[in-house]
A protein has these predicted regions:
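Glycine-rich phosphate- or other oxyanion-binding loops that anchor nucleotides, phosphorylated ligands
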Residues: 2, 26-227
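Short, conserved "active-site rim" segments that organize catalytic pockets and cofactor/ligand binding
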Residues: 1-20, 42
Length: 227
């Protein structure tokens, strides 16, 4: 079994890369793919870059070139629900695009308007979060290419699909994984509330995600060990 583990920013994968054993790094298509073992399992870890195009391209490379048989994407997101707070995690049961013409996208394989996280990976993520003492919600993740940092945009997305969080890669990863028949799950820690304060924290003040990254590394490592 080969696990493909992804993040959008270097900070989201660097700590995990440091935990790998028997590491080799293979550059391909502008991305460094770190091949090694984690908890005795074969993994390939990479930083895809931000946005849907980067995420989709990197997912396909993980599957086609590196033989990934399960995909785990871990990163931060903007919170859209009162059920959880900053630092809590959304595990993607449903992942979708709020900004796409879905009746056109679903005309091609995998013929879906939204994507479903793999039940085994979701269960493993829930157990890993519980073990790490992290509050987790199995819910809906919305993916768009624009950072959501104002109340008007947040309200529009809420009215359209009522997601639990918003981010910029998950649906693209999930779409490509589904197209290839590869199990996938998206994990997101809440860094902000997808409003003006979120823009200030992430864009202006360059929010440090070190605390989440340490937690995410434990969660992903525990998942891989259990699977």
């Amino acid at each position: 079994m080969i696990f493909g583990i992804m993040g959008a920013m270097p900070d989201e994968v660097d700590q995990l890369c440091a935990k790998l054993e028997n590491v080799t790094v293979e550059p391909y298509g502008g991305v460094d793919y770190h091949k090694g073992t984690l908890a005795g399992k074969q993994v390939v870890v990479c930083c895809a870059g931000m946005g849907k195009a980067n995420a989709a391209a990197t997912t396909q490379v993980l599957i086609t070139k590196f033989g990934a048989e399960k995909i785990i994407f871990s990163g931060i997101a903007g919170n859209m629900t009162s059920k959880i707070g900053i630092g809590d995690v959304v595990i993607g049961k449903t992942v979708l695009y709020p900004d796409a013409q879905l009746d056109m996208i679903c005309q091609n394989p995998p013929f879906l308007k939204e994507y479903t996280g793999d039940p085994e990976l979701i269960a493993a993520a829930e157990k890993a979060c519980a073990k790490a003492g992290v509050k987790a919600l199995v819910g809906t993740i919305a993916t768009g290419d624009l950072f959501v940092g104002d109340s008007e945009t947040k309200a529009a997305i809420e009215a359209k699909c009522a997601p639990d969080c918003v981010e910029m890669e998950g649906a693209a990863v999930s779409q490509v994984a589904a197209k290839n028949g590869v199990p996938c799950v998206i994990l997101r820690a809440m860094s902000d509330n997808a409003d003006e304060d979120g823009h200030e924290v992430l864009v202006v003040k360059k929010f440090s995600i070190a605390e989440y990254v340490a937690t995410a590394t434990r969660i992903v490592a525990a998942m891989v060990e259990a699977l």
